[in-house]
């Protein structure tokens, strides 16, 4: 790792050898991918048929990706599988169902960053070859051979985009052209959200936007804030479950104490008591409808910013009521 990594940036190294001391044709660290010490395999150049040596290399790289040898219950569609314990003289084409499961376990549990990012084109040292489905220097696209290409935007013969192409992908791109202006690309997800529409000049949907803060929502029961419609009932539900609702107004009066539990905000380590008009912007109080318990509160439960605290007023980030 001290020599090869300094020569060229790489995620994994597969080393070809002529002679092995043991009766094997390949070795690799299982689950070593992306580890600078263990992301490596050693493969014996055991056959004049390149495809068979490549199969062995794929097998060892499979080990690096956290995949073990197949067992009797594994299958890849009736063919000899790449991670089989037994060497086949027939070309191996597929990983088994067991291999796929182990691979995804490796990806999701260990989150190996080196194979989750797209390599720079400049990191590819082999000469660019149009038609190998690998986007390399000098290419705008590479969809494989002209016979196999399924990319409408790409000229498979030149690995360049067709002259008429406006876009390749995106919410506002369809068959390599911008979708007409006005077509909705992101519908509103909730009441305080707004729909976004394509501009006709870009493949990307415009930035997600929402209704202006202070606009009424929930039949004037609350006001929009940062795309949400915050109300104390929903906050009580999140803290105490379906039997909880907002407590009566008298419960909030203790927020004027300014002690460890009941206050509006913290300034220089001091709990500042709520002014009378701000009491519903401090500690949140809930009522348990099942057990008729009033004034329930949680150490995590301060009234959310933007919550309606009086007619025409909401709580701001300073835990103060202000005119919407």
Curated annotation (Swiss-Prot):
Monomer. Its cofactor is Zn(2+). Glycans are attached at residues 97, 296, 305. Keywords: Calcium, Disulfide bond, Fibrinogenolytic toxin, Fibrinolytic toxin, Glycoprotein, Hemorrhagic toxin, Hemostasis impairing toxin, Hydrolase, Metal-binding, Metalloprotease, Platelet aggregation inhibiting toxin, Protease, Secreted, Toxin, Zinc. Zn(2+) binds at residues 59, 63, 69. This is Zinc metalloproteinase leucurolysin-B. Residues 1-119 form the Peptidase M12B domain. It is found in: Secreted. One of its GO terms (cellular component) is plasma membrane. Disulfide bonds join 34-114, 74-98, 76-81, 130-159, 141-154, 143-149, 153-176, 167-173, 172-198, 185-205, 192-224, 217-229, 236-286, 251-295, 264-274, 281-315. It comes from Bothrops leucurus (Whitetail lancehead). The keyword Protein transport does not apply. PROSITE patterns: ADAM_MEPRO, DISINTEGRIN_1, DISINTEGRIN_2, ZINC_PROTEASE. Belongs to the venom metalloproteinase (M12B) family. P-III subfamily. P-IIIa sub-subfamily. Residues 127-213 form the Disintegrin domain. The active site is at 60. Its EC number is 3.4.24.-. A motif (D/ECD-tripeptide) lies at residues 191-193. Gene3D superfamilies: Collagenase (Catalytic Domain), Disintegrin domain. Ca(2+) 1 binds at residues 11, 114, 117. Ca(2+) 2 binds at residues 129, 132, 134, 136, 139, 142. Expressed by the venom gland. Inhibited by EDTA, but not by PMSF. Pre-incubation with 2 mM DTT completely abolishes activity. Pfam families: ADAM_CR (PF08516), Disintegrin (PF00200), Reprolysin (PF01421). GO terms for molecular function: metal ion binding; metalloendopeptidase activity; toxin activity.
């Amino acid at each position: 790792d001290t020599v090869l990594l300094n020569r060229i940036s790489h995620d994994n190294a597969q080393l070809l050898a002529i002679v092995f001391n043991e009766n094997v044709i390949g070795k690799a660290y299982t689950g070593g991918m992306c580890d600078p010490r263990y992301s490596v395999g050693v493969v014996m150049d055991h056959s004049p048929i390149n495809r068979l040596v490549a199969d062995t290399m794929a097998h060892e790289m499979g080990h690096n990706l956290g995949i073990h040898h197949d067992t009797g219950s594994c299958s890849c569609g009736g063919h000899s599988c790449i991670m089989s314990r037994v060497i086949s003289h027939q070309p191996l084409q597929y990983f088994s169902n067991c291999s796929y499961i182990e691979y995804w376990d490796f990806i999701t549990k260990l989150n190996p960053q080196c194979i989750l990012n797209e390599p720079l084109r400049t990191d590819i040292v082999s000469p660019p070859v149009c038609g190998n489905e690998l986007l390399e220097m000098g290419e705008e696209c590479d969809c494989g051979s002209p016979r196999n290409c399924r990319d409408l935007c790409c000229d498979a013969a030149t690995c360049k985009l067709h002259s008429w192409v406006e876009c390749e992908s995106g919410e506002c791109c369809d068959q390599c052209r911008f979708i007409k202006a006005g077509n909705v690309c992101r519908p509103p997800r909730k009441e305080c959200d707004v729909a976004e529409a394509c501009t006709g000049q870009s493949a990307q949907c415009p930035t997600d936007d929402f209704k202006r803060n202070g606009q009424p929502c929930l039949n004037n029961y609350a006001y929009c804030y940062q795309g949400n419609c915050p109300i104390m009932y929903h906050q009580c539900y999140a803290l105490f479950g379906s039997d909880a609702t907002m407590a009566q107004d008298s419960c909030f009066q203790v927020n004027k104490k300014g002690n460890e539990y009941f206050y509006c905000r913290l300034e220089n380590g001091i709990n500042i008591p709520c002014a009378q008009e701000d009491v519903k912007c401090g500690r949140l109080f809930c009522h348990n409808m099942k057990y008729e318990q009033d004034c329930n509160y949680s150490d995590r439960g301060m009234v959310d910013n933007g919550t309606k605290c009086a007619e025409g007023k909401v709580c701001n980030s300073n835990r103060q009521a202000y005119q919407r």
